[in-house]
């Protein structure tokens, strides 16, 4: 399908609209002018016919001359006087061009008629004349040639005006459309440059049109988001590759040990197998968490949501954690009010354990963790507090980014891969919640989850 240029479409549409509008306007004006002019011609003919009638009432017929009749006639008029027996008595005109013979029985036509003769239209008015010494009638013949010429001139003027207005409109439309489409052409060229050279170029358009400037700003914002998404994707691949490379290198190294000495040394074989299994489990966990970050949406969650009793779930998880980590102190301050939320039960358990696991990893000295729930303004609030190393303020905006670690030198020894908080944040957001953090170095961290 052949596409037309926006500028050409604009010129064609505006020109056609202007031409049709002016043409219709001129037709309406001409219609009213024709009616006005025609009525004026009829009034002139009626006036002359009435003057002729008055002339016959003012003096005897024998005293009426052709000069008297001509004095009562206007331009382009002819008068014929008949007696009661249809005998022609007078015929005179002020204009030699008016010479028309009605050519039919005058007695039977209406008072006012139109008749075309040799290409010219005439008004014919029949007026009865009855005086003391005369009885008959007059035929006033009024030529409409001048009227027709004026109407033709009006049509020509209207057409010329329409053509001139159309040309002017087309010229203005061309200039205006060029000014409008010029930024769009620049926008298209910039897009091509960005596609060729990358995200480093941004649109720099300063026009007099708010819409074009808004379009350019929106495009720049969109490109910034795409660039950010691209960088995140690239960083994600790099981080994932790095996270997978380390355990794979460890496994490869121990397999080489087994190949060299493990066949003969059971201790080396046992140690290498245990480490390889541990690193393999780390890889499996990393892959599972990566999959968790890339699946699920709001519709799926809402369709499988169940009522989760927050306090009951926390008590159950804390009981298990006390058995698993007997060296840690778990304190709870749970509200007496019933806290319920609609979500997948395993997701609540998952996000709760992520925060508890995070607290355990970074509170190896005091080993004291507190969980608190409360209801405020219909908001269900869960607070998890540890007394560990804390999070620097400059890192707090990034801790939910994938693979981000506050202390990169300690994270691997603590078993973290920087995905847990990202997963927790995603679960909270998909269920309509939010999360806040409050932390001080060497004093601890509090995560506040709000539903």
Swiss-Prot record:
InterPro entries: ArlS_N (IPR041610), Bact_Sensor_His_Kinase (IPR050398), HAMP_dom (IPR003660), HATPase_C_sf (IPR036890), His_kinase_dom (IPR005467), HisK_dim/P_dom (IPR003661), HisK_dim/P_sf (IPR036097), Sig_transdc_His_kin-like_C (IPR004358). It catalyses: ATP + protein L-histidine = ADP + protein N-phospho-L-histidine. Gene3D superfamilies: 1.10.287.130, 6.10.340.10, Histidine kinase-like ATPase, C-terminal domain. Keywords: ATP-binding, Cell membrane, Kinase, Membrane, Nucleotide-binding, Phosphoprotein, Transferase, Transmembrane, Transmembrane helix, Two-component regulatory system, Virulence. Its main location: membrane. Pfam families: ArlS_N, HATPase_c, HisKA. Residues 178-231 form the HAMP domain. Its EC number is 2.7.13.3. The modification Phosphohistidine is found at residue 242. The keyword ATP-binding applies. Induction: Activated by agr, SarA, SarV and MgrA. The chain crosses the membrane at residues 11-31, 156-176. Residues 239-451 form the Histidine kinase domain. It is an enzyme of class 2 (transferase). One of its GO terms (cellular component) is plasma membrane. This is Signal transduction histidine-protein kinase ArlS. It comes from Staphylococcus aureus (strain NCTC 8325 / PS 47).
């Amino acid at each position: 399908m052949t596409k037309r240029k926006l500028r050409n479409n604009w010129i064609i549409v505006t020109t056609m609209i202007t031409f049709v509008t002016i043409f219709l306007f001129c037709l309406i004006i001409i219609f009213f002018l024709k009616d006005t002019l025609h009525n004026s011609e009829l009034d002139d003919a009626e006036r002359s016919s009435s003057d002729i009638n008055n002339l016959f009432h003012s003096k005897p017929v024998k005293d009426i001359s052709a000069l008297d009749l001509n004095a009562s006639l206007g331009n382009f008029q002819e008068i014929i006087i008949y007696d009661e027996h249809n005998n022609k008595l007078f015929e005179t005109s002020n204009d030699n061009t008016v010479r028309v013979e009605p050519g039919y029985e005058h007695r039977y036509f209406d008072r006012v008629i139109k008749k075309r003769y040799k290409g010219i239209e005439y008004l014919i008015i029949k007026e009865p004349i009855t005086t003391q010494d005369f009885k008959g009638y007059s035929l006033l013949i009024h030529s409409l040639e001048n009227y027709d010429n004026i109407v033709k001139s009006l049509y020509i003027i209207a057409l010329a005006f329409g053509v001139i207005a159309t040309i002017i409109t087309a010229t203005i439309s061309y200039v205006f459309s060029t000014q409008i489409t010029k930024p769009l052409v620049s926008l298209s060229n910039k897009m091509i440059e960005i596609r060729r050279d990358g995200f480093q170029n941004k649109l720099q358009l300063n026009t007099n049109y708010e819409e074009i400037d808004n379009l350019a700003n929106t495009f720049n914002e969109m490109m910034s988001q795409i660039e950010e998404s691209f960088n995140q994707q690239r960083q994600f691949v790099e981080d994932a590759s790095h996270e997978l490379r380390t355990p794979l290198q460890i496994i490869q190294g121990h397999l080489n040990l087994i190949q060299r000495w493990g066949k003969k040394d059971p201790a080396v074989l046992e140690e290498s197998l245990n480490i390889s299994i541990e690193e393999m489990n780390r890889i499996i966990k990393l892959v599972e968490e990566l999959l968790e970050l890339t699946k699920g949406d709001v519709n799926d969650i809402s369709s499988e949501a169940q009522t989760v009793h927050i306090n009951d779930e926390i008590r159950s998880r804390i009981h298990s954690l006390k058995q698993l980590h007997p060296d840690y102190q778990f304190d709870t301050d749970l509200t007496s009010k019933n806290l319920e939320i609609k979500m997948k039960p395993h997701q609540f358990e998952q996000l709760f354990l992520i925060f508890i696991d995070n607290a355990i990893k970074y509170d190896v000295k005091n080993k004291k963790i507190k969980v608190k729930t409360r209801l405020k303004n219909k908001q269900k609030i869960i607070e998890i507090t540890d007394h560990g190393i804390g999070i620097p303020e400059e890192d707090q905006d990034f801790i939910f980014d994938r693979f981000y670690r506050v202390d990169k030198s300690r994270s691997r020894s603590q078993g973290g891969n920087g995905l847990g908080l990202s997963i927790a944040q995603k679960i909270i957001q998909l269920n309509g919640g939010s999360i806040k953090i409050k932390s001080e170095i060497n004093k601890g961290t509090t995560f506040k989850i709000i539903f």
